[in-house]
Amino acid sequence: MKQVEMNQNSRLTPHFTLGELCKTKYVTADGNIPSRAVIENLIRVCGWLEELRVVAGVRPRSKVFAGVRPQSKVGCAVDAGVRPQSKVASDCTLAPDPWAAPEAGEAIVINSGYRSPEVNRLAGGVPSSNHVTGCAVDIRCAGKEQMIRYAAILLDIADETKRDFDELLLEQHGSVCWLHFAVRSKDNRRKIAFLKV
């Protein structure tokens, strides 16, 4: 039987590759190589990820905190919501701005995407997992705040575009957080949950 190989660098969307969505630490006889139907599902999910990437990178600061933002500079009177210019008075020192939006096009890192049935079993997934059909990804998050922010953005995208998703699961194991996001071609359940695993 001829061994089938997968082009790891094949782009599903401008910022996501097939290799990135099929990577696994498990070595299996099937090579975790997706079918054409699975690739179509991965492309659908990656479309949402592209939108998340853009919105996470350019989202304006929340209006809720407009009047209570911390100063962007230590020892300087800086108007809330106004980003300082590159030329700064010498008596002002930069301080981290916890309310600042990330740079445009924030990288979205995928921990897990497609899993063949064998890889899914080794990973401890349930047989009916959306990962097996290529409909789900686990998005790496730097912490709870980023996980909640990504979830809120995905909910906004769903509401604003009138599209649905199947699962939006905010998951945590110890101090490690990730966001499980799934979109099916039909019969999406819009299941939202916080899970400690």
Description of each model-found segment:
Residues 128, 133-136, 141-197:
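Catalytic cores and adjacent binding grooves of peptidoglycan-active enzymes
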Residues 41, 45-48, 119, 135, ...:
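Amphipathic alpha-helical interface surfaces
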Residues 57-88:
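Long, intrinsically disordered low-complexity tandem-repeat segments
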Residues 47-55, 104-124:
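Extended, low-complexity, intrinsically disordered C-terminal regulatory tails
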Residues 55-56, 64-65, 76, 102-108, ...:
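Short glycine-rich, low-complexity/disordered patches
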Residues 1-55, 100-103, 190-197:
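Extracytoplasmic cell-surface/polysaccharide-interacting catalytic and binding patches
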